[in-house]
């Protein structure tokens, strides 16, 4: 049996980590076939680095017949592309799990995966982070903050987003 085909949805910091893992031999059972991102230039640079195709649309990425698509983009990307990815026969690895806060969308994803025999894998780092936050919240008074390398626009459509996040604070 040959390598499993892997597509990446996103072209930022997290997508680069996936490409780097492949270059370091940590994903030997996978062949990176394509990258899809919002900005063409960044997508082309990441695809060149990973030795794969830079895609302009989700249809172009899915035409490469990936077995898995790793989402490393945003909640909105999951909502825009998730059902289509699963319906194509590819399973998804989702980092932006906030997309599933939308119960209607969650239902669509669950049904599509069941009908097409595909799966959704939620990155354990996100789940582990929630476990830590839950534990801290049970300890009484605690303060928490979020530090991210993603832009605040990536939080649009989530319960965390507030318009003031878009203001330049520097």
Residue ranges of each PLM-predicted region?
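N-terminal Rossmann-like dinucleotide-binding module
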Residues: 1-46
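Active-site-lining helix/loop region of Rossmann-like oxidoreductase modules
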Residues: 9, 17, 121, 126-170
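Short active-site oxyanion
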Residues: 31-34, 65-67, 118-120
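Short, ordered loop/turn segments at secondary-structure junctions
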Residues: 38-40, 97-100, 126-127
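A short helix->loop->beta-strand "cap" motif at the edges of active sites that frequently abuts
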Residues: 52, 88-90, 115-118
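General beta-strand structural signal in soluble alpha/beta enzymes
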Residues: 55, 71, 94, 120-124
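Beta-loop-alpha module in the N-terminal Rossmann-like domain of NAD(P)-dependent dehydrogenases
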Residues: 56-87, 99-103
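Rossmann-fold NAD(P)-binding glycine/threonine-rich loop
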Residues: 97-118
